Amino acid sequence: MRTFIAIDVNEEVKKQASEIIEKLMKRGFGATWVSEENMHLTLFFLGEVDEQKISEIAEHLCRRVRGFPSFSFTVKGFGYFKRKMSPRVFWLGVENTDRLMKLYEELRNELSHHGFSFEEKFVPHITIGRVKYYPDKWEKLIEDIDFPPIEVAVDRFKIYSSTLTPTGPIYKVLYECQFEGGLIRYA
């Protein structure tokens, strides 16, 4: 199954993000927009992993971060990744990431013991849309878009499955790892 590891964001972030998506749609941008229930900060995309292996990985990851102190990061700002001269992905920025980066490194080290390697640099962000089409002079149309700072408390991460459909991905929580409470298995 197609899997990834993520941190959920709070309702305030989801609400503000939805307002930005609405503005972008009204301004003529077309994208596969991320629904509120699917908004998250991806730590790792693992790809296809069989059920038995993901169970083992979840147990080891959770053991690795047991007792990790809870922390927060700030969601702030709006931006995009480009392909050539075109917007490819719209995202919300993430600041105050020292503890987030420590968590990322702990998980990355554990995942390396399970045969995973991650070559791309981790750039924390929250994807809100994968751009399909955009209007002329699109850069002018997003100059005034910003995201006010919102703090997100973190005391756990989740492992999700992702099923791709014509209307967008369907995410399902498989495991939740609470820093103080241990592993919770869904499914």
Curated annotation (Swiss-Prot):
Protein name: RNA 2',3'-cyclic phosphodiesterase
Similarity comment text for this entry: Belongs to the 2H phosphoesterase superfamily. ThpR family.
Entry-linked NCBIfam families: 2_5_ligase
Catalytic residues, chain numbering: H40 (proton donor), H125 (proton acceptor)
Organism this protein belongs to: Thermotoga maritima (strain ATCC 43589 / DSM 3109 / JCM 10099 / NBRC 100826 / MSB8)
Keyword Metal-binding: no
SUPFAM superfamilies found in the cross-reference section: LigT-like
GO molecular function: 2',3'-cyclic-nucleotide 3'-phosphodiesterase activity; protein kinase A regulatory subunit binding; RNA 2',3'-cyclic 3'-phosphodiesterase activity
Free-text function comment from the UniProt entry: Hydrolyzes RNA 2',3'-cyclic phosphodiester to an RNA 2'-phosphomonoester.
One Pfam family named in its UniProt record: 2_5_RNA_ligase2
Motif (HXTX 1): 40-43
